[in-house]
């Protein structure tokens, strides 16, 4: 199937033209018999160094199939992939954000992986990407959302400290927010991180919707959002979510990157595991509680899935490409990933070897939360559109739009996209 047959979601014509030239001028690197690898880590020197160390070691052991790397800034990466697909210049190996994988597989960019069954089985579910019954991507790590709270504030209010075994209920969470909001030394009870953009809103707030009993789409066949995104349970979620801001418990315009929490303006912060160490450095490890998500009635959930590796459908040497991915997924490199960027390894055997996730490690609670509550975003090629539509709907709800009609329109828009793409059927 031609890789240009279907539209790459989110790629503009100008970006295609610009990025084709950029990629073509830098592409290549394997030479005769070699394989090419593209990554989004051009602006992340620590993660890029881990990948480069694996490439160097692999190339020493496999001189006939050396890997050549191209690193792009994350903001330009997806456009680069889309442009390369249009021009027929996809690399052999590419990394991708987990929820994007079904769209790229459906569009013909990716081939199913042929890694060993032993490795596949050893990887946690949230770091594996399946579509249409086949494994297309695996990731070296994942992270988790969590609630960060000041121990001193929680103790002052006297509210129960939730655990993975017994998360807060909605009533308990609402009570805790009310008590925290009454503390005069803080401006708001919680920073909900609404200043963040991109994929954050679906990643962070759809799990709350799902805990209420709604969802982004019917996950049985991904054929409709009606009755899920606009269900009574979804309306209840929207009503509660907006009340956080309308009732003055959270700011609609918080500082970016958790600065309100770090500067002592709020006692609680809805964030990811990547903010734990900075928070502990600011206040001390004992003062920062890492708390699980709230159970709003249908189980507690957090978003799952991070960056993963796949093999392009046009690879001239898929055997070597899969072999490199297996090499990169060894414990040695999973530990390096974890120590470099703070995420937990996707294979259990690597965890005790890490600095932060071993028993008693500063980030051990983050992995515990992720393992207990991670829910992958819908594995459908239409997810990119679903994500964008939900993002807009949630923002509109916070800004005061009618909740039921906003969710009705969002469900209609998602269903229209599904129909327009013939149900995103595999061919």
Set out the residue ranges of the language-model regions.
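Short helix-initiation/N-cap motifs at beta->coil->alpha
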Residues: 71-80, 99, 168-172, 251-263
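Glycine-centered hinge/linker elements that transmit conformational signals in sensory
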Residues: 174-181, 215, 219-252
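Alpha-to-beta junction loops
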Residues: 85-96, 186-187, 263-271
């Amino acid at each position: 199937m031609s890789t240009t047959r279907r539209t790459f979601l989110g790629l503009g014509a100008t970006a295609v033209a610009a990025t084709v030239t950029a990629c073509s001028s830098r592409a290549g690197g394997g030479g005769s018999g070699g394989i090419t690898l593209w990554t989004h880590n051009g602006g992340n020197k620590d993660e890029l160094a881990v990948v480069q160390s694996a490439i160097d070691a692999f190339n020493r052991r496999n001189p006939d199939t050396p890997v050549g790397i191209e690193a792009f800034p994350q903001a330009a990466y997806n456009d680069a992939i889309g442009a390369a697909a249009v021009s027929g210049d996809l690399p052999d190996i590419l990394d991708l954000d987990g929820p994007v994988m079904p769209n790229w597989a459906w569009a013909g960019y990716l081939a199913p992986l042929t890694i060993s069954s032993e490795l596949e089985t050893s990887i946690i579910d949230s770091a594996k990407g399946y579509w249409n019954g086949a494994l297309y991507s695996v990731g070296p790590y994942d992270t988790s959302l969590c609630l960060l709270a000041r121990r001193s504030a929680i103790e002052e209010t006297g509210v129960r400290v939730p655990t993975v075994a017994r998360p807060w209920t909605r009533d308990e969470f609402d009570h805790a927010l009310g008590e925290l909001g009454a503390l005069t030394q803080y401006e708001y009870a919680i920073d909900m991180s609404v200043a963040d953009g991109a994929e954050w809103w679906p990643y962070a707030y759809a799990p709350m919707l799902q805990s209420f009993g709604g969802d982004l789409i019917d996950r049985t066949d991904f054929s409709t959002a009606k009755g899920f995104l606009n269900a009574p349970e979804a309306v209840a979620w929207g009503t509660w979510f907006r009340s956080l801001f309308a009732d003055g418990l959270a700011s609609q315009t918080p500082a970016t990157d958790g600065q309100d929490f770090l500067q002592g303006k709020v006692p609680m912060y809805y964030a990811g595991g990547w903010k734990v160490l900075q928070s502990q450095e600011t206040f001390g490890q004992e003062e920062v509680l890492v708390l699980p998500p709230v159970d709003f009635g249908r189980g507690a959930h957090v978003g799952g899935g991070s960056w993963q590796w796949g093999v392009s459908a046009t690879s001239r040497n898929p055997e070597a490409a899969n072999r490199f991915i297996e090499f990169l997924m060894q414990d040695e490199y999973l530990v390096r990933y974890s120590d470099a960027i703070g995420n937990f390894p996707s294979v259990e055997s690597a965890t005790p070897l890490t600095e932060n996730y071993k028993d008693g490690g500063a980030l051990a609670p983050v992995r515990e939360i992720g393992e207990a509550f991670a829910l992958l975003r819908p594995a459908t090629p239409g997810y990119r559109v679903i994500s964008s539509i939900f993002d807009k709907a949630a923002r509109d709800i916070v800004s005061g739009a009618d909740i039921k009609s906003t969710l009705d329109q969002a469900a209609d828009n998602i269903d229209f996209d599904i129909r327009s793409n013939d149900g995103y059927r595999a061919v």
